[in-house]
Each structure stands twice: as C-alpha cells, then as structure tokens.
Design a protein with these regions (language model features):
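Glycine-enriched alpha-helix->loop->beta-strand junction motifs that scaffold or abut catalytic
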Residues: 8-14, 28-35, 49-54, 75-79, ...
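Catalytic cores of alpha/beta
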Residues: 1-9, 42-50, 87-105
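Glycine-rich phosphate-binding active-site loops on the catalytic face of alpha/beta enzymes
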Residues: 17-23, 56-65, 101-121
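Catalytic beta/alpha-barrel core
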Residues: 1-4, 10-19, 33-45, 53-63
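C-terminal helical cap(s) of enzyme catalytic domains, especially alpha/beta-barrels
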Residues: 27-31, 98, 114-142
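Active-site mouth loops of central-metabolism enzymes
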Residues: 29-38, 82-89, 117-118
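Generic structural signal for well-ordered alpha-helices
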Residues: 3, 24, 44, 66-69, ...
C-alpha cells in the first residue's frame, strides 16, 4: 500500500530493504522500476522472475561482500546488482565492489556523515561525493 501511495504521489522508482512480490506487482502494473533487497541467490532469481531488473544486495557486508556478488555473476552474468550496506566512499572498498561486478552501489551514512550534516559542512559532503564518483568512474565496467 505504501508503494502505491508513493507512486500516486509521483515516485519514479521504488527501492526496498526486502523482496515483496506484492510491491513487484504494483510496480509492474504501473511501469515503475522496483529494486528489492535480496540476501540470497533464490531471492534474486525470484525477484527477476517478477520483473525486477536491478536487485539490491542488503546488507551486502553481512551477505558475503564482494565475493557473494562475484559468485552470483558467474552463473548469472545478466544479473544487475546494487550493493548497499558496508559500502564506503574509498578506493579500496568501491574498487572491490565494482571488480566483483556490481552495476551500482548505495551509500548512506558513509557518504553523508552525521557530523558533517550537523555542522553544515556541505563542502566535505560535496568532496566525498565527488571523490566517490571519480573512483566509481575508474572501476565501473559499462
């Protein structure tokens, strides 16, 4: 019901922490991309069968990290994966995820530190974002 409300309010996509087949149906009927959180190969396969093009691995660090992504991509190279949780805006971390085969990553508190927000330090956030994008451009395979 929440996804339908946000779609009615103009959402262009829906991202969730888990896979919900009912949300997949709502999004498919309205031609809205749905990126569910998946923690296993079975969840990814089921999400793909219901029309999800991009699957979010969440929490990526707890599910197996970059090696989990690499192991999924070997038998399922068509799988588009977004890693979230345990993703940091550093070259070591981002290069590991992109070398493993992620399509994209999601970052929250590591990219937008509470201290920077509380201190209105928008320049440090801008710098973190800029640095992260430069690293991603270096390693992302198009």
């Amino acid at each position: 019901a929440t996804a339908a409300l946000f779609i009615q309010l103009g959402a262009n996509f829906v991202v969730g922490p888990l896979f919900n087949p009912e949300i997949a149906k709502i999004c498919n009927r309205r031609l809205i991309p749905y990126t569910p959180g998946c923690g296993s190969v079975s969840e990814i396969g089921f999400a793909q069968e219901t029309g999800c093009d991009l699957c979010k691995i969440f929490p990526a660090g707890n599910v197996g990290g970059p090696s989990f992504v690499k192991n999924i991509k070997a038998p399922m190279p068509w799988t588009l994966i977004m890693a979230t949780g345990a993703v940091e805006p550093t070259e070591e971390n981002l290069s590991a995820w992109f070398k493993a085969g992620v399509t994209c990553v999601g970052m929250g508190s590591k990219l937008f530190p509470k201290e920077a927000i509380a201190g209105n330090d928008w320049q440090s956030i801008t710098d973190l974002c800029s640095d992260a994008l430069s690293i991603i451009q270096k390693y992302r395979q198009v």
